[in-house]
Amino acid sequence: MFMNSMLRVSRQRAAVRSTVSLYRGFVSASIRRNEQNVVKAAAQELANAKEPSDLIGPGGRDGEVPTDLEQATGLERYELLSELSGRDAFDMKPLDASRKGTLTDPIMVTSLDPYRHIGCTGSPSGSHNLIWMTVYKDKLRRCPECGSVYKLKFMGDPNAEHSH
């Protein structure tokens, strides 16, 4: 009795698997036949990158290990191309810690988003432990330890949609 039910189940599974594998083989074969091989040259300088597909590297040549620039794609490639052209892609330099920001003369923080996370270590730099804060567009933010004031300078597109 048990053996008969096991044989019946195994026959059903075998039938389903063969149907699925035939279907998958047929679908992928038709896609491969209709696919056109369009090879586009990758941008080697930031000025030549006009659209997101330009930020896909060419990859390594056969038999060679690719360099970072050949292999990088997307934001990593954008950062590498920016460094080659002498620009700081993501504005990673530290904030001005030579002075304290005041309500009339705050320390300006640039951002492409309507907010940015910053860390304050006081003025002069290192005078207190690191305190993390979030600075929002159109609002001043004061460090609770040293009293330095920060303001966000929004440089992004105000009509941009969030993509997540």
Curated annotation (Swiss-Prot):
The keyword Transit peptide applies. Coiled coil: none annotated. The keyword Magnesium does not apply. GO terms for molecular function: metal ion binding. Pathway: Energy metabolism; oxidative phosphorylation. Pfam families: COX5B (PF01215). Residues 1-33 form a transit peptide. Zn(2+) binds at C120, H128, C143, C146. It is a peripheral membrane protein. Keywords: Membrane, Metal-binding, Mitochondrion, Mitochondrion inner membrane, Transit peptide, Zinc. Component of the cytochrome c oxidase (complex IV, CIV), a multisubunit enzyme composed of a catalytic core of 3 subunits and several supernumerary subunits. The complex exists as a monomer or a dimer and forms supercomplexes (SCs) in the inner mitochondrial membrane with ubiquinol-cytochrome c oxidoreductase (cytochrome b-c1 complex, complex III, CIII). Component of the cytochrome c oxidase, the last enzyme in the mitochondrial electron transport chain which drives oxidative phosphorylation. The respiratory chain contains 3 multisubunit complexes succinate dehydrogenase (complex II, CII), ubiquinol-cytochrome c oxidoreductase (cytochrome b-c1 complex, complex III, CIII) and cytochrome c oxidase (complex IV, CIV), that cooperate to transfer electrons derived from NADH and succinate to molecular oxygen, creating an electrochemical gradient over the inner membrane that drives transmembrane transport and the ATP synthase. This is Cytochrome c oxidase subunit 4, mitochondrial. It comes from Schizosaccharomyces pombe (strain 972 / ATCC 24843) (Fission yeast).
